[in-house]
Amino acid sequence: MADVDVKKAVVLLSGGLDSATVLAIAQAQGFECHTISFDYGQRHRAELIAAERISRVSGAKTHRVMEMNMHAIGGSALTDDSIDVPVSGVEKEMIPVTYVPARNTVFLSYALALAEVLEADDIFIGVNAVDYSGYPDCRPEYIAAYEKMANLATKAGVEGHKMHIQTPLIDLTKAEIIQTGVKLGVDYSQTVSCYQADKNGAACGICDSCRLRKQGFENAGVTDPTIYASNL
């Protein structure tokens, strides 16, 4: 088969549960997947090791790690050492301190540039508006606006090669995401979700992300393979 017939996609891969599921979905849809991860100064750097491993084991065509210093900007518990990672439970009525200013816009822009170079029309990202309703850059209207911008601001878009921002998880609960991944053979023991995982990827068990992950497995009726430092 000629390369022109290959469906290519850029998949944002953090190394976490959601993005690993998105990669499996894209592959199940027949895309040749090119994964992209970001070393942006985050606390939980173990996710980068997980992302490389997931990409390799899944058979992704290529994997890239983009480096940027969002730690120098700060403003988030994930990038600013002066802001503690919350461990008291998920706040539903406010934007949480784990929101990283403009992160998805920055990440999608790198993915968009790569997609243009690869002549890929599709970008997959694991944003979710159900469990993380407080994140402004996880909302459907944000994705729609970004896709519109992508088609206005790129050579591909101007020449009629419409760019698509694919968000297959956006309306799913964490339990539904896990159930989908299990059906597709995702090995969740290889993923890292914790906001403050240690260098080996061991999860704290008490941050918002760990709480959502544990609850998701419980609601899905699936055994959680994660090793948690705390049973809270």
Swiss-Prot record:
Q: Name one Pfam family in it.
A: QueC
Q: Name one GO molecular function term.
A: zinc ion binding
Query: Is Nucleotide-binding among this UniProt entry's keywords?
Result: yes
Cofactor annotation: Zn(2+)
Q: How is the cofactor bound?
A: Binds 1 zinc ion per subunit.
Pathway connected to this protein: Purine metabolism; 7-cyano-7-deazaguanine biosynthesis
What is the catalytic activity of this protein? 7-carboxy-7-deazaguanine + NH4(+) + ATP = 7-cyano-7-deazaguanine + ADP + phosphate + H2O + H(+)
- Which residues take part in binding ATP? L13, S14, G15, G16, L17, D18, S19, A20, T21, V22, L23
Alphabetical UniProt keywords: ATP-binding, Ligase, Metal-binding, Nucleotide-binding, Queuosine biosynthesis, Zinc
Residues holding Zn(2+): C194, C204, C207, C210
Is Metal-binding tagged as a keyword? yes
EC number(s) from the headed UniProt entry: 6.3.4.20
List the protein's name. 7-cyano-7-deazaguanine synthase
- What is the species of this protein? Hydrogenovibrio crunogenus (strain DSM 25203 / XCL-2) (Thiomicrospira crunogena)
